[in-house]
């Protein structure tokens, strides 16, 4: 299993959990972003800087990932694409995207986009909480235990 982070929008606290997990389990972890992100020195942790532009990092993750890899992202369309390739997708809040729930999540996302386009302000997600961090770490541990 290889780990990929959609790193431009991934909270620092979640990246740090992933750094520790990659070291502990000796799994390769790729941070894919259009800006340089500081990483610890490790033969398991790699920074992949892509050009700027819409979905450039997402396309790179889809290109690189394989079945049974784990992608950390809150980007629903990216999660859908990697699931179609047989990979797993986990949000920074600990929600596992699956073939069974991804279509519903895409529909909700599209509905919210339509509402925003019509001028209705929906606000963004709340800040990452300690409960979110724990949910993420617990779910990550369960996924890595099966690798």
Curated annotation (Swiss-Prot):
<dbReference type="Pfam" id="PF02639">
    <property type="entry name" value="DUF188"/>
</dbReference>
<protein>
    <recommendedName>
        <fullName>UPF0178 protein IL2341</fullName>
    </recommendedName>
</protein>
<dbReference type="InterPro" id="IPR003791">
    <property type="entry name" value="UPF0178"/>
</dbReference>
<comment type="similarity">
    <text>Belongs to the UPF0178 family.</text>
</comment>
């Amino acid at each position: 299993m290889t780990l990929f982070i959609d790193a431009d929008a991934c909270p620092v606290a979640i990246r740090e959990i992933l750094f520790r997990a990659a070291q502990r389990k000796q799994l390769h972890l790729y941070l894919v972003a259009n800006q340089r992100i500081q990483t610890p020195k490790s033969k398991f942790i790699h920074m992949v800087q892509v050009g700027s532009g819409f979905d450039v990092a997402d396309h790179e993750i889809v290109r690189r990932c394989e079945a049974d890899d784990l992608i950390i992202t809150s980007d629903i369309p990216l999660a859908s694409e990697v699931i179609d390739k047989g990979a797993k997708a986990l949000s920074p809040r600990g929600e596992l995207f699956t073939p069974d729930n991804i279509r519903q999540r895409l529909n909700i996302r599209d509905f919210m986009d339509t509402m925003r386009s019509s001028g209705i302000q929906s606000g963004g997600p709340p800040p990452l909480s300690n409960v979110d961090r724990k949910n993420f770490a617990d779910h990550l541990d369960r996924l890595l235990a099966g690798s």
